From Swiss-Prot:
A motif (DEAH box) lies at residues 142-145. It catalyses: Couples ATP hydrolysis with the unwinding of duplex DNA by translocating in the 3'-5' direction; ATP + H2O = ADP + phosphate + H(+). It comes from the Archaea. The lineage of its organism: Archaea, Methanobacteriati, Thermoplasmatota, Thermoplasmata, Thermoplasmatales. InterPro entries: DEAD/DEAH_box_helicase_dom, Hel308-like_dom4, Hel308_SKI2-like, Helicase_ATP-bd, Helicase_C-like, Helicase_Hel308, HTH_61, P-loop_NTPase. DNA-dependent ATPase and 3'-5' DNA helicase that may be involved in repair of stalled replication forks. The gene is hel308. Belongs to the helicase family. Hel308 subfamily. One of its GO terms (molecular function) is ATP hydrolysis activity. This is ATP-dependent DNA helicase Hel308. Keywords: ATP-binding, DNA damage, DNA repair, DNA-binding, Helicase, Hydrolase, Isomerase, Nucleotide-binding. Its EC number is 5.6.2.4. Monomer. GO terms for biological process: DNA repair.
Length: 674
């Protein structure tokens, strides 16, 4: 069967540049099952054509005048998928990406045909109105095996459960990597399972041990990683190498860059004096880079784009890249099969290693992919052999953890999906957790959650369970009830900024900062009257204070050891928690609300208060706003009446940008006058 045999308009074929190719067996079977009204679970290797299945289902749903939502586990994947699915506009569909602001209501969905969401965003929208699912005809769940992730999995499972609970008629297409219990997940979804080991680009998997490469039934001596990388790049291929730590990624990339002469003029330049710029710029011209979560979002995007466009030949990355964006390469090397964590040194899971080596082989460029796992010792050699010979671990549910039950219990009561413990238990019977474990401890945990929520003012009970104003707000704001209790205490404390930053930093949504200097944190706690307070939260508050005082990311790294990517992650969460704190003021201390709204904007933008007006202009961030301010342009009105030729003289402003910001400032001033 070819694409043209599907019976679609010719415009559908245009999505594939008019290439009327033969469908793979798993694509044909999935489309046939979907047309029979079935839910579908597709479990196939990476780059095996899952996107065509989604396109087909979305198109058929659109023809029925129904909406589709496409759910992914990570923001980076959502942006990548949005770029891909935006092509559906050529078929007349309205496509929307929504990944920010967890306080949005789902009303906007009515204006679109296809909406791409992270699982957290989808869950937060359902907190506002779960019945949005009544307008959704199709839910595509990408990377459904992520329900087995201890941290992100429960949210994805909650989204799927809520959607099916509210509207059992919503069709589901679940896309998965190869997992050993795919049939168990498919049964939970009431879905037809389409399982295949087919890869369009064949994969060869080998082991590098004691300078011997065992690959494809052959053994080759005197081989090391440098040699394999050099051979692959010289032959026109690209290489991904996975290592266990950021420092190892940086050091290895620097060493590998010395193997190659300069081949491009790539240069990264961060507006905010980023600490990694110099190191990256040493190696980028040689076609080599590192990639880890300490880099800023902009730096990571720059590296990923350069690799896709084949300007970069080698990336040395930490495992976070394997779970993120799709970056295939001819050769993938798993250099480290262990990691250091809370439990000491542990081996990577089979699933993680399979995800890494599964990226080997770039369709359209490579005839085959090569995945090589490095064994550093006799013990790891035995483990590596098991990675190759055994199936990935089964996917298990984590939605039954007490804190997840508590979060979901408040949400279900606030949404009106449950008004009693019996109804809450009924909701949990629709979860994958129940499919795997039966009742287990769930009734007890629901009972404990209800007791906790009543005692702390989130819900009340007369004839039935109902959310209080406080409980409803917390559910809509999408924050943990324990964090809400912490924030509530702030309103009985001082109203200064440092105290607010401390309470924000206490919340579980903000990961603690690994900083050695306890003395500065103790001084901070003493200054706000919390001498016996939480040292780790105080460290985070100190970093946030530097951020809103306009310290550069380089200075924050030098002072506190917080890398730009880690800073961005904490700022993003602190932005959300401070937004929530400002909203809670309307219940507990309305007179503090305006001050907290100002703090929220300062955290969001990383600015002092006097720059708040200027950063309303798109493309003007904290650095450009400060340059304008120091040049005597203090607000939007003054910018609107400025000569662009004066602005373009400032560092960081091109002629085009200067004209654009003045034009936008004029528009804002005009709107304010009306």
């Amino acid at each position: 069967m070819k694409i043209s045999d599907l019976g679609y308009d010719e415009s559908f074929l245009d999505l594939f540049e008019g290439n009327d190719f033969e469908l793979y067996d798993h694509q044909r079977m999935a489309i046939e099952q979907f047309r029979k009204g079935k839910n579908i679970m597709v479990s196939v290797p990476t780059a095996a054509g899952k996107t065509l299945i989604a396109y087909s289902a979305i198109y058929e749903t659109f023809k029925k005048k129904l909406k589709s939502i496409y759910i992914v586990p990570l923001r980076s994947l959502a942006m990548e998928k949005y770029e891909e699915l935006s092509r559906l506009r050529e078929l007349g569909m309205r496509v929307k990406l929504s990944i920010g602001n967890y306080d949005d209501t789902p009303d906007f969905i009515k204006r679109y045909d296809v909406v791409i969401l992270t699982s957290e965003k989808a869950d937060s929208l359902m907190h506002h109105d779960p019945y949005m699912m009544e307008e959704v005809g199709l839910m595509v769940i990408d990377e459904i095996h992520m329900i087995g992730d201890e941290y992100r999995g429960p949210t994805l499972e909650t989204v799927i459960t809520t959607a099916r609970y509210v509207n059992p008629e919503t069709r589901i297409i679940a896309l998965s990597a190869t997992v050993s219990n795919a049939s168990e997940i498919a049964e939970w979804l009431n879905a037809s399972l389409i399982k295949s080991s087919f890869r369009p680009v064949p994969l060869k998997v080998g082991i590098l041990y004691r300078n011997r490469l065992f690959l494809d039934g052959d053994a080759r001596s005197d081989v090391d990683i440098n040699l394999l990388v050099k051979e692959t790049v010289d032959d026109g291929g690209q290489v991904l190498i996975f290592v266990s730590s950021r420092k190892r990624a940086e050091d290895m990339a620097k060493n590998l860059s010395q193997l190659f002469d300069p081949i491009n003029d790539l240069k990264v330049s961060s507006e905010d004096a980023n600490v990694y710029d110099d190191l990256l710029n040493e190696m980028l011209p040689h076609g080599v880079s590192f990639h880890h979560a300490g880099l800023s979002n902009e730096q990571r995007s720059f590296i990923e784009k350069a690799f896709r466009h084949r300007k970069l030949k080698v990336i040395v990355a930490t495992p976070t890249l394997a779970a993120g964006v799709n970056l295939p390469a001819r050769l993938v090397i798993v250099k480290d099969v262990t990691r250091y964590g809370d439990l000491g040194i542990t081996y990577l899971s089979n699933m993680e290693v399979k995800q890494m080596i599964g990226r080997a082989g770039r369709p359209g460029y490579d005839q085959y992919g090569i995945g090589i796992i490095y064994a550093a010792s006799a013990n790891s050699y035995q483990v590596v052999k098991e990675y190759i010979s055994e199936e990935p671990e089964p996917v298990d549910s984590y939605i039954g953890k007490p804190e997840k039950v508590r979060f979901n219990t408040l949400a279900a009561i606030a949404m009106g999906l449950a008004t009693s413990q019996v109804e809450m238990e009924e909701f949990y019977r629709s979860t994958f957790y129940y499919a795997q474990n039966g009742e287990d401890e769930i009734p007890n945990r629901i009972n404990e959650s209800i007791k906790f929520l009543k005692e702390n003012g989130f819900i009340k009970e007369k004839d039935s369970l109902r959310a209080t104003e406080f409980g409803k707000m917390i559910s809509n704001l999408y924050i943990d009830p324990e964090s809400a209790i912490i924030l509530k205490k702030y309103f009985d404390d001082n109203d200064d900024i440092d105290t607010a930053l401390y309470y924000i930093s206490l919340c579980r949504e903000i990961a603690p900062i690994n900083m050695q200097d306890d003395y500065a944190a103790m001084e901070f706690l003493e200054s706000i009257g919390h001498i016996d307070g939480d040292i780790e939260a105080a460290k985070t508050a100190l970093v946030l204070r530097e951020w809103i005082s306009e310290a550069s990311t380089r200075r924050i790294f030098e002072m506190y050891g917080v890398a730009p990517g880690d800073l961005q992650a904490r700022v993003n969460n602190a932005d959300w928690i401070s937004y929530s704190l400002a909203h809670l003021a309307s219940i507990f201390k309305p007179e503090r609300r305006r001050k907290l709204e100002i703090l929220n904007m300062r955290i969001k933008e990383g600015i002092r208060e006097e720059l708040m007006d200027l950063v309303l202009i798109p493309a003007i961030g904290r650095v450009r706003a400060r340059r304008l301010y120091e040049a005597g342009i203090h607000n939007v009105q003054e910018l609107a009446f400025s000569d662009p030729s004066r602005i373009k003289m400032l560092y960081g402003f091109s002629d085009t940008l200067a004209n654009a910001v003045v034009k936008r400032a004029k528009a804002i001033v005009s709107e304010r006058i009306r």
